Every structure is written in C-alpha cells, then in structure tokens.
Swiss-Prot record:
GO terms for molecular function: guanyl-nucleotide exchange factor activity. It comes from Homo sapiens (Human). Keywords: Guanine-nucleotide releasing factor. PANTHER family: EPITHELIAL CELL-TRANSFORMING SEQUENCE 2 ONCOGENE-LIKE (PTHR46857:SF1). May act as a guanine nucleotide exchange factor (GEF). Coiled coil: none annotated. This is Epithelial cell-transforming sequence 2 oncogene-like. CDD domains: F-box_ECT2L, RhoGEF. Pfam families: DUF4347 (PF14252), F-box-like (PF12937), RhoGEF (PF00621). Residues 566-754 form the DH domain. Residues 75-121 form the F-box domain. SMART domains: RhoGEF (SM00325).
C-alpha cells in the first residue's frame, strides 16, 4: 500500500514513478479530448484559467517556448499573401512609386502593371484606352498612362490664352460670338443655296406637265438657263466640300502620342532608372549642346560628320512644318534642357530661311505660329543666367534687320541669341568671321564642330554639293534601310576620307609648299600649251593685269591698317571681293575668248564668229561694267575717310544692270551652244580639255566660271547691309546706301525667281520620267514638297469599330505631295541576280487636288499602327507608315499644304 501513497493529489501515486507516468498521460489525453470538444470560447476561458494558476516561472517557460518555436519568416509578401491583398497594398502607391516598385522583382512587376491599378489613374484625367485589352493582356493601361504623361503639351502663354482664356490682353471682339456669327452665316448661306436650287428646279418643269391647269401659273416669264442652275449647284457643292475638308483637317492630331491616336512606346532605360531621381544639379551638369541642321545646306552630310562627339544633332527636311520641327527637337532632347542650341540653316543677313514658306525676319516674327515656335524653342534651352544661348549660323549680325531679329527673339524667349557678323564673303564663309556678342572667349562654331572639318567644308561647299548629288544616288540603295542621320554621317565620313583635306588644313607649311609647286608646274604647262597652239599668250596677258592689281592690293593694305573702324573693314572687303570677281571674269576673256579670236583671225578657226559672239558677248559686257565699277571704287577709296561715300557708286552700278539681264536671259542658250559645239567640233573639245580645270582657271571649267555672275549679287547685298549697319544715321551716304540696297535686292529676287523656275521645271521632269504613265506635271508655280513611302492596307470588315478592325497589306505606295495636288503611285521593287541592290519602279495611280482631299486618322490598336485614310472624289486609300515619326511629319506637312492651297 506504500507504493500507492499520494501527495497533493488523490490520483497521482507518490513513489511508483512508472504508474505515476501512466496515470498522468491518461489524464492529459482525457483533458485533450475534452479540449478538442470545446468551442473556441471555451478553450479561451480554459487557457485563461490555467494561466491564472501558473507561477511566474511557468509563465516564463511558456514565453520561452513560443520564442523558440515562432521564428520570423523573411519572405516576399506578394508570394505568400493572396493576390487581391497584394493589389490592395499596391493601390496606395502613386504612379511614380508603382514604376519604381516594378523594378524590385518579377512578381512585383507583374502585380504593379495590372490594369486594375492603372485604369483609375487614367480615367481620373480622362485618358481612355482606345481599345479593350484581352484577358491575357496586361500592362495596357500603364503604357497608356506613361504615354500620356510623357507627351503632355507645354502651353505657351498665348496657347493657354487661346485654350483657357487666362492671358489678360485687350481683345477687340468676342471670339466666341464671332465664331457663332460665322457659323450662323454659313448655315444661312447653305440654306439659301438649297432653297434657290429647289426653286430653280421647280421652275424648270418637265414637258409632260405643260398642259395642266397650273402650268401657266408656274411657268416663269424667263426660263433660267441650264448652265446657271448647274453653276448654283456647283457653288453649293464646292462650299460644302470646302467645309468638309476643313473639318477633316481639324480632327487630325496636332501632337504625337495624343491619347487614343497614337502608339504608346515603352519607357526607355534612361527613364526607368531615372524614376526615383530628381536632382536638378546633376541634370544641369549633363545638359548637352544641340545642333539643328537643315537639309537645304549644301553637302549637309559633311556638316553632320563635322559635329563633335557628345553634341546632339538633328537633320531636318526643309519641307516640314514648324510643328514637326518642334517635335523632332523634343524627341531628340528626350525631356532634357540643352545648354545651347545651334541652328545651321540657309539664310542671309536679314532673315533665316528656316523652312519652306517660313523665312524668319522682322516682318513675320510676331505671327502667332512663328512666335509660338520660338517661345517653345526657348523653353528647351537653359536661361541666360545659366549660360544658355542660341546660335544662328546665318550672318544676322551683318545688318540692322538681322540685329533687330536677334533682339526681338531675346526679348520674346529670355534667351541670348548670337550670330556671325558676316564680314567674310564667300559661300558660308561667314561662320568663320566674328560673332556678335560672343561671351565665351571662342567662336560658337568650336562648341559644336570640329573646326578643321568645318573649314574644309566651307572652302569647297559648291563643289562638294555637286559631287554629293552623285554620291547620294550611288549609296542610297545601300543605306535606305538605315536611319537618315546614320546614313548621312556615313556619307559625310566617306567624303572626308576621300578628300583627305583635314591634314592639309592642319599643316599650313605643307599647303603653302604644295601651292608653290603647283604654280610652277602650271607655268610650265601653260608655256608648253602656248607652243603647241601657237595662239594667244595667256601668261603674258595675266602678267600685265597683275600690274594693275598691285595698286589695288596696296590700297587694301592701307585700309586694313585702320582695323578699329568697322566701316573701313567692310569697304575693304567690298573692294577685295570685287577685285577677285573681276579677276574671274578676266580669266574668261584671257583664257578662252582671246585664243579663240586669235585662231579665228589667223584663218585657223576653232569656233565661228557667230558662236563666239553667242557664248562670250554678254560675259564680256559684264566684265566691262564691273571693271568700270572697280575703277570707280578704287578712285573713291584712294584717300578713304569716315566722311567718304560709296552708296553713290553702287547706285550708279545698279542702274546699269540691263547688261546682267541680257546675260541671264541668254544663259540657257549659251550653255546649249557650248554643249553643241563640244559635240560637233573636235577642235573645240580639245581646246576645252586643254584649258578647263587648270591652275590658271582656278581649277574651274568654262560653265563653272559662268556661274559667278549669279552668285555675286548675294555678296553685294550682304556687304551693303554691313556698310549701312556701320554708317551713322546722320551720314550723307545712308540714303544712297538704302537706294543701292533696294536696287540690288530687287535684282537678286529676279535672279532667284529665274533659278527657282528652272530648278522646279527640272525636278518635275525627273519625277515625271521615273513614274510610268504619269501625266504632265509641269505647271506654273508648282513644286514638290515631300515624298512619303507608305503601305496600302485593306480593311476586312468596315462595319466594326476601329479598335477591332483587321487590315492586310496589299500594295506599296509612294505619295508625291505638291503644293496643289497629291500624286499617288504604286511602288515596285525588282532584284537582279547576283546583285544586292534593288531597283524601284513607280506606276501612276491617281492624282487628287489638295482642296478636294479628305484626311481621317486611324487610332492605333493591336492590329494596326501609324495608319490614316486619304479620300478623294473617286478613290480612297488606307495607308500606314513604317514608323510613328513619319506619320506625324507627313500629316503635319499635308495639313499645312491643304490649308495653303485653300487660301489661294
């Protein structure tokens, strides 16, 4: 019985441990069974009662047990929690934080791109997706949000006033009331036309109702003619058609990546990594220099290749619009601000020939679209306090009008504008002259360009452009798949490698030695040619002329001593350039005319007297006129002083320009006569071969020498503007200078118009020749604006909405946009065995007048991108460009061309 002795419990034996253990386990099992049968509340009460009975040591034991068993699990909550909880957590993040969270891991990226997170953020701003994503597609709303945010329009004060009415400027009339009145007048006119048409049709009764009782009442006293009725109907139709065309233009997107109208590009890596960075100091330190290059610049590929590494450069076509040019700049800068912007385009000392139809000058600088362009351009460059500046590679600093343009642009944008003074004459030599207001201790050209390459380009611009026309034609088939900027740089590098002129420019001693050697060789060749021809001694004639020019050279040195007087420097440049020009004309007389006349007088005629008269009569008269002008300048400048005048001499010269008019009128006949004589007279061919492109002729041929009269007037105009710029307002010469400038400017416009007409005619002939079945394109004032290659699509079912339509590619088209019509042609490609390049052929399809062309944009969807509709009176084309930029640029240019054609 001793073994069953108990203590503190009637059920637990004290001394028998095995029995004690057995009984304890049975009772624990019994309590556990009861615990399992209890409810949750009963279990909680039981645990509470047990813990109240426990001592501190027992409670500490429970705490230690929980701390050992309950270890903290370091796992990603998005992989453990249900998806709806994770999405609920992510819904509290901002769009910027969601983009940053997407870079953490793939589960986070998948969750943060769900449409349920991004759709409310888009709908909040009214950015609706143009199509419904499929079940297995995600991220569409995120891409839509990013596209809308990254391409938000920055409104200038003028645009904000037009949109929201926030610009407090006095208005002459209520715009809304004016628009309402205009619509009312249009509706009234349409209804009047319709009523008149019904009335006229009612009066013109058919013959079978002439015997009715009411025929005598309805029969008018004067029957209207059928042509009158037709004219009324045509007038009504034209008014409605014009309104319809204008409405279609207004519905086109005016910005790239507008919500629901364009594709939604993914963020670039730079933007992804920069989501959480917002350091203005770092962005200021990394601001790039930006260079804008016009395709109108001769040999622009070599200018592209001259751009320094690290400078962002863009080549734009001269035919684009201001809106398209801003888009190209915005895309190239990619949200950054440029430290400086350089604009390398065509122009003169008064205006910038920035785009086709936009010569920026004092007269049109404040036009709304031009002003908005410069305001937005100024927002892309750093402020003047931060060292930002805009550099025009156009000699605006050489005239009062150009300086006024720079001043107005600075006031308009708050940015510093600078340009070369243009003292150095010649083809684009002004970029090497002094710059107006340069504050950086060096010319702005050294900021953007490798100066040795740029100097090479500027020295041989005219020759390089002629050469590059052939190079482009030969290399384009190989580079047509590349971007234009890349292919342009490759062609420019090819030209520099072929020329090999950079090392010569860097080594002046070598260049001088080479020039001396070539001069000695030319003297020997000239003497040998004289012996063979037994004709005119060219060298002796030139040596006599050198005596006359020694006095001019001494006079130039005297004027050069007064370097502080800017007016004297410009006059010296006028005298020096005129001397060089007369030398060029005397080369024609001494090298070509004199030997031909000597051969004719010695009964060994190379050309007949009639042909010599046709080819050289006008150029010799020009030589006589300019020789007299040079003598007058020399006599006036023998004792030059601040009070002396040159305007009177130039005015007298400008009143005798009929000599030049005769030359330009006969210019085509002169060139054709040279070509005919070269082909038909072997002796003349040999004569030209012996004298063309020698050192005596400055490596020029006879047709190239005849180009100089047309180019001289641009130099006259720039120099006269520079003289007037540095002439005080009270000076006696100022009035004569203004008269002379007007004379030269008017005559230069006449030359430019002739040149433009010939160029347009040749260009239209080339297009007509390459398009099979093309009608006659040559018309007055017609010119080509742009050529765009597109794919023609066919819609399988036009009854469904745009977002669900399926398209198939059926043809390749080329669209030739003229200023008055659109020519549509099919484009075919043919390959030759064993050849990599292909041949492109064009087949005429149709032409549509621009004022009858309707345009409709097709929003991007999963099935089609960059598409639009062109519809004429008889045809309809669904077109698509290969890239988004081409569509935006094409629609912008087309819209501008249609508006211009309807305003005529």
């Amino acid at each position: 019985m001793e073994s069953f002795h108990t203590r503190f419990s009637a059920w637990t034996p004290f001394s028998n441990k095995s029995l004690n253990r057995q009984l304890f386990q049975e009772r624990v099992a019994l309590i556990s069974h009861w615990f399992d049968l209890w409810t949750n509340k009963q279990r909680q009460e039981f645990l509470f009662a047990i813990f109240l009975r426990c001592t501190k040591s027992q409670l500490r034991f429970v705490q230690d047990w929980f701390s050992e068993r309950m270890q903290v699990a370091k796992v990603d909550f998005s992989t453990v929690l249900p998806r709806f909880i994770s999405l609920y957590i992510f819904s509290f993040l901002s769009p910027k934080d969601l983009c940053a969270a997407a870079q953490v891991s793939w589960p986070w990226k998948f969750l943060t791109e769900q449409d349920c997170l991004w759709m409310p953020k888009c709908v909040k701003f009214g950015w609706f997706l143009p199509y419904t994503p499929t079940d297995n597609e995600y991220g569409a709303w995120k891409r839509h949000y990013i596209a809308c945010v990254s391409h938000l329009d920055w409104l200038t004060p003028r645009e904000a006033a037009a949109t929201y009415g926030t610009l407090n400027e006095p208005k002459t009339e209520d715009e809304e009331l004016l628009e309402r009145q205009r619509e009312k007048c249009l509706r009234k006119r349409i209804w009047e036309k319709i009523a008149l048409r019904k009335k006229e049709l009612f009066k013109v009764r058919p013959p079978w109702v002439s015997g009715t009782c009411c025929s005598s009442v309805l029969k008018p006293r004067c029957q209207p003619r059928l042509s009158q009725t037709v004219r009324e109907r045509v007038g009504l139709h034209e008014a409605l058609e014009k309104q319809l065309v204008l409405t279609s233009l207004e519905t086109l997107p005016k910005r790239s990546n507008i919500s629901g109208s364009h594709s939604y590009p993914l963020l670039s890596k730079k933007n992804w990594h920069g989501v959480h960075k917002n350091d203005d100091r770092s962005s200021y330190a990394l601001r790039p220099h930006f260079m804008l290059i016009s395709s109108r610049i001769p040999a622009y590929e070599m200018v592209m290749e001259s751009v320094k590494a690290g400078v962002v450069s863009v080549v734009y076509e001269h035919s684009v619009t201001l809106e398209s040019l801003l888009y190209l700049i915005e895309k190239a800068l990619d949200g950054q601000k440029a430290q400086s912007i350089g604009i390398f385009s065509d122009g003169d000392s008064r205006e910038i020939n920035l785009l086709q139809g936009y010569k920026i000058g004092v007269k049109n600088l404040l036009r709304p679209e031009v002003r908005d362009f410069w305001e937005k351009l100024g927002s892309y460059v750093a402020t003047e306090e931060e060292g930002g500046h805009v550099d025009f590679f156009v000699p605006l600093g050489a005239s009062e009008a150009g300086i006024e343009v720079l001043s107005q642009l600075s006031q308009l944008t708050g940015t510093f504008f600078t340009a070369p003074t243009g003292i150095a004459t010649g083809s684009y030599q002004h970029i090497l002259s002094d710059w107006l207001g340069s504050q950086w201790g060096k010319a702005p050209s050294s900021i953007y360009f490798c100066e040795s390459k740029l100097q090479t380009w500027s020295s041989f611009t005219d020759f390089l452009e002629e050469t590059l026309k052939t190079v482009r034609k030969q290399l384009y088939p190989f580079f047509k798949e590349l971007q234009k900027s890349i292919s342009g740089r490759m062609i420019g590098q090819f030209m520099f490698d072929t020329m090999g002129m950079t090392n010569i420019l860097n080594n002046q001693d070598t260049a001088q030695a080479l020039a001396d050697g070539l001069m000695e060789l030319s003297k020997e060749d000239s003497e040998r040619n004289v012996v063979e021809d037994n004709s005119w001694d060219t060298k002796s004639r030139l040596s006599k002329n050198d005596l006359n020019f020694e006095a001019l050279i001494n006079l130039e040195r005297i004027l050069q001593k007064d370097s502080a007087e800017k007016r004297a420097r410009v006059v010296r440049e006028l005298l020096q350039s005129e001397r060089k020009y007369v030398q060029i004309l005397e080369i024609v007389r001494d090298v070509y005319v004199a030997p031909l006349k000597a051969a004719l007088s010695s009964n060994r005629a190379i050309l007949s007297a009639a042909n010599i008269q046709i080819i050289f009569c006008d150029i010799l008269q020009i030589l006589s006129l300019n020789r007299q002008f040079l003598d007058n300048l020399r006599d006036r400048l023998q004792e030059w002083g601040p009070a002396h005048c040159v305007g009177e001499i130039v005015t007298k010269f400008g009143s005798q320009l009929n000599t030049y008019t005769n030359f330009f009128n006969n210019y085509p006949v002169i060139l054709k006569t040279i070509e005919k004589c070269r082909e038909m007279i072997p002796a003349f061919r040999t004569f030209l071969k012996r004298h063309d492109k020698t050192i005596v002729t400055k490596m020029l041929s006879l047709p190239e020498l005849l180009l100089y009269p047309s180019r001289r007037f641009e130099e006259y105009l720039n120099l006269l503007y520079a003289v007037r710029l540095h002439t005080p307002a009270e000076h006696v010469d100022r009035g004569d200078l203004t008269t002379a400038i007007d004379q030269i400017k008017k005559y230069k416009g006449y030359i430019d118009q002739m040149k433009q007409n010939i160029t347009m005619k040749d260009h239209l002939s080339d297009i007509q020749r390459i398009i099979w079945g093309c009608p006659t394109l040559s018309e007055v004032n017609r010119y080509l604006i742009r050529v765009q290659d597109v794919a023609q699509l066919h819609c399988c079912d036009e009854e469904i909405s745009f977002s669900l339509r399926l398209y198939e590619h059926i043809h390749d088209l080329s669209l030739f946009l003229f200023n008055d019509a659109l020519l549509v042609s099919s484009r075919g490609t043919s390959h030759t065995p064993f050849e990599r390049t292909s041949k492109t052929t064009y087949q005429f399809i149709a032409s549509v007048a621009l004022h009858r062309l309707l345009i409709e944009n097709i929003p991007d969807s999963k099935y089609v991108k960059n598409a639009f509709i062109l519809q004429g009176p008889k045809y309809k084309w669904i077109c698509a460009t290969e890239i988004e930029d081409d569509k935006f640029l094409w629609l912008s240019v087309l819209r501008n061309a249609i508006k211009s054609s309807m305003e005529k």
